Amino acid sequence: MMHGTTRQVLSLITNPLDVMCANLQTVRGMMGARPDILGAHLEGPFLALSRKGAHDPECLKDPVPEYVDRLLHAANGCLRQITIAPGIMTHMFNAMNGLHHREPGPIPAAVEDPRVTVELINDGFHVQDPMVRLGFGFAPHRIAFVTDAMAATDCPDGHYLLGALDVNVIDGHARLASNGAIAGSTLTLEKAVQRAVLELGFTPTDAVEAATLIPAKAFGFDRANPVTKQPLGLLASGYAADVLLLNPATWAVEHVWCDAHLLR
């Protein structure tokens, strides 16, 4: 919350199924006392081996009913997103086929469908700036900033774990020690919005929308719901009072309110 994130969906990376089930149960148990936690996102284990990124290949599985049922049972209603969900493209341009004029792949299919929300990691490393601009042009008002942040976020460079995999963080960039694959990020949404406005020249409206209203819409939290009760994503009557006060010059977070409670 020091960086202005008032609500979060916690991403769980591929692990042995028992570990993933235990992690889901932990998230579900935390939600009662932590209104900022909206649920869990499973990034795996149902991934293609050829596009596994920084996931343990030994833990990848086919989405057979037995495995799906175990995860759903463990989640007990807290599961908000799985990366294979057709309505959300997880971090566009990363861990997928790129654009090619004879092999268009998933990106054109996603941007052509107005129902699809497109996630994007705006750290200047996962996706270069010209491609970020291209993404916003392809899918206006459908880009959702995500961090893909791992344990090294807001911490010094060094050695960390991503699940059971060793990760080296150098200059803020996380890579697997074994093969150099990108292993998540150290990005915060504060920095993603700062980059969008100050470095990429996006309007404040577009940058803030990508970190607030668009993600809220993707999960159905832009309207009254059983989890947050009041809708999220706008400064408007009837919405939860999640508010940030930003420095007008640097766009750094100075004060944070969550559900009308001053946190910083």
Show which residues each predicted segment covers.
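Divalent metal-dependent hydrolysis catalytic cores, especially in the metallo-beta-lactamase
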Residues: 1-23, 36-49, 66, 75-90, ...
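Short, small-residue-enriched loops and turns at beta-alpha junctions
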Residues: 16-18, 49, 55-58, 95-100, ...
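Generic structural signal for well-ordered alpha-helices
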Residues: 21-28, 68-72, 132, 193
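Glycine-centered positions in the ABC transporter ATPase nucleotide-binding domain
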Residues: 259-260
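Active-site core of metal-dependent hydrolases
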Residues: 66-157, 263
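His/Asp/Glu-enriched, well-ordered alpha-helical/loop segment
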Residues: 105-120, 135-246
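Conserved phosphate-binding/catalytic loop of the ribokinase/pfkB sugar-kinase fold
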Residues: 48-70
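Short, electropositive alpha-helical surface patch
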Residues: 20-33, 203-208
